[in-house]
């Protein structure tokens, strides 16, 4: 069984959960602010195992995945079972009505690949989807709740394809645990109860959603209550009988479309054709050589691997190892590298099936030139997009869209050495708040830029029919000598990129074990202001960073990093102390 090594993180006090903020500047989609509050901080212990390991954001889901792995299931099998459970016990973060990105290592073929199951804009969507009759961007709250923001879900299609390719156990056996849990009821966790209370107004807007998440006395479901979801159980029974494709070709798909159009206060344009024609796209991993490792992740429409790769590539020109994690100068360099990477992200990164993108964003000479813009000990005055190599350059405008994901991450390694890193989402907390067949529908389309043009130039991440919105999700597998060394990822809006970069630097540069790296206080700089994690030793960086010329804020940081590391043939795992996650293995 699993063994644990105790390690106490550098947290001073436990921050309180914060309510989601829905007051955003017009013209922004949902990227800078993350709606899912951090849970009270907990002390987490490094987990040890020999044969297999799983790390998820919810203990119930982790136990279900563990049981699948224990029974001989593959990493893909375990993910299928876990995702079905998360859609029930963590509905604010992911589910059947959302999308995901997966990085998968096939041990038999020694092959690393990625799968894009991002939600997709309807064929009837126009660049004016989130603009009023005068062409002005809608306020975020006016866009997110209802049918307008719903894209074609991709998660169920991903589950089916992963099982078809990599599954070992019968499909119906993987859906059975979540089906039973939905029938018998699960215990509402403190985190879910807090999210329900924070989202009370939006959840009360539609009768079906209100009936499920509210008690008869008008209060939201409380921690410790047992909550049954019979429609969800019926959905899983149908999927277990007819397969994943039936979600798209049968009654469920038709009812998703009806629900989107039936939200008469904010209807969408999703069609039956959008549902039936959805495809998961297998894409080549984006990899960056770093300190003897290959850091690999998801390419566009995710900006994750490119932006994380740029941060690492720029910081590699400084001796972070010598500086160490307590050095304000080290964090200044990481922060300015992040600002430069985010500048390129805002200018260039989007769905490359629709817009051309520079080929040289991870070119070694380009990153070396970007690193020369950074002066240790002095804040970079401005971070402008660079001029990487192009094949077919076009003039794009900077995008200030914001990503507001309520998201979850799963890391799994099975006994055969197969590994999967999946970040899964419905975007905002509880998505669009529309509910059908026991699950919530995403609001993923608000990850597009609400504006189409800026200063007469097109924005790469603008709405277009059939396009997939840009994401910051960064599921990562670090390879060493051709085999997985680290499996990691996180939720958290566009801060995901900083959370993952921090964890990689902490393990690969500073020699921390995976739990220490995850628990390391968060310090993030995306757009010029340093954000330091409240109640942790990161606050000690405030004065030194201000002296360097930065504006600094202190706030709760809602990462949910789940990671597994392989050292000397042994599996070690970590879960984020800011959430309810659990690592299990044998």
Residue ranges and their predicted role:
Residues 416, 466-468, 500, 509-556:
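Extended C-terminal subregions enriched in glycine
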Residues 2-14:
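Bacterial N-terminal signal peptides that target proteins for export
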Residues 88-95, 99-114, 131, 266-271, ...:
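Active-site rim segments in enzyme catalytic domains, especially the processed small/beta chain
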Residues 30-63, 67, 75-243, 247-249, ...:
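Noncatalytic scaffold domains of N-terminal-nucleophile
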Residues 317-425, 576:
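Internal maturation/activation junctions in enzymes
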Residues 282, 404-407, 471-473:
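Short, small/polar residue-rich loop motifs at catalytic or cofactor-binding pockets
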Residues 11-23:
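Bacterial N-terminal signal peptides
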């Amino acid at each position: 069984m699993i063994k644990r090594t105790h390690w106490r993180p550098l947290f001073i006090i436990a921050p309180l959960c914060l309510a989601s903020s829905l007051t955003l500047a017009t013209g922004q989609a949902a990227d800078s602010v993350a709606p899912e509050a951090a849970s009270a901080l907990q002390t987490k212990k490094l987990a040890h195992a020999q044969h297999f390991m799983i790390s998820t954001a919810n203990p119930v889901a982790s136990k279900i995945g563990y049981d699948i792995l224990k029974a001989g299931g593959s990493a893909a099998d375990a993910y299928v079972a876990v995702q079905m459970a998360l859609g029930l016990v963590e509905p604010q973060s992911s589910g059947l009505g959302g999308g995901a990105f997966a990085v998968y290592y096939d041990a038999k073929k020694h092959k690393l690949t990625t799968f894009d199951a991002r939600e997709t804009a309807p064929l009837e969507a126009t660049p004016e989807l989130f603009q009023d009759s005068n062409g002005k961007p809608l306020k975020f709250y006016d866009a997110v709740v209802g049918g307008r923001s719903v894209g074609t879900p991709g998660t169920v299609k991903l589950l089916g394809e992963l099982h078809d390719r990599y599954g070992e156990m019968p499909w119906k056996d993987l859906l059975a645990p979540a089906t039973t849990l939905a029938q018998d009821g699960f215990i509402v966790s403190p985190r879910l109860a807090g999210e329900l209370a924070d989202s009370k107004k939006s959840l009360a807007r539609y009768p079906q959603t209100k009936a499920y998440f509210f008690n008869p006395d008008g209060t939201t479901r409380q921690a410790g209550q047992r909550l049954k979801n019979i429609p969800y159980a019926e959905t899983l029974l149908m999927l277990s009988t007819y397969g994943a494709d039936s979600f798209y070709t049968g009654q469920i798909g038709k009812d998703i479309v009806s629900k989107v159009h039936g939200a008469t206060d904010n209807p969408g344009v999703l069609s039956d054709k959008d549902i039936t024609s959805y495809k998961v796209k297998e894409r080549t991993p984006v990899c960056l050589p770093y300190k003897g490792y290959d850091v690999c992740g998801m390419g566009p429409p995710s900006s994750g691997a490119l932006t994380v790769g740029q941060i690492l590539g720029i910081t590699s020109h400084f001796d972070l190892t010598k500086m160490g994690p307590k050095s304000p100068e080290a964090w200044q360099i990481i922060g300015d590298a992040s600002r430069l990477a985010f500048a390129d992200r805002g200018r260039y990164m989007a769905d490359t099936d629709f817009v051309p993108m520079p080929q040289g964003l991870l070119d070694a000479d380009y990153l070396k030139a970007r690193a020369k813009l950074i002066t240790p000990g002095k804040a970079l005055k401005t971070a402008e997009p660079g001029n990487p190599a192009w094949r077919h350059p076009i003039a794009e405008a900077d995008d200030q869209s914001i990503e507001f994901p309520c998201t979850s991450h799963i890391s799994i390694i099975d006994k055969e050495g197969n590994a999967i890193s999946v970040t899964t989402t419905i975007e905002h907390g509880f998505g669009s708040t529309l509910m059908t067949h026991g699950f919530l529908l995403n609001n993923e389309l608000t990850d597009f830029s609400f504006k189409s043009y800026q200063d007469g130039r097109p924005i790469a991440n603008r709405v277009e029919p059939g396009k997939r919105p840009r994401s910051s999700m960064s599921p990562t597998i670090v390879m060493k000598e051709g085999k997985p060394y680290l499996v990691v990822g996180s939720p958290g809006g566009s801060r995901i990129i900083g959370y993952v970069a921090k964890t990689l630097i902490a393990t690969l540069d500073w020699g921390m074990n995976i739990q220490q790296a995850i628990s390391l206080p968060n310090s993030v700089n995306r757009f010029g202001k340093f954000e330091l994690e409240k109640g942790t030793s990161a606050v000690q960086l405030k004065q030194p960073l201000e002296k360097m010329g930065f504006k600094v804020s202190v706030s709760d940081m809602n990462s949910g990093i789940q990671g597994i590391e392989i050292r000397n043939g042994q599996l070690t795992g970590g879960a984020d102390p800011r959430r309810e996650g659990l690592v299990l293995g044998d």
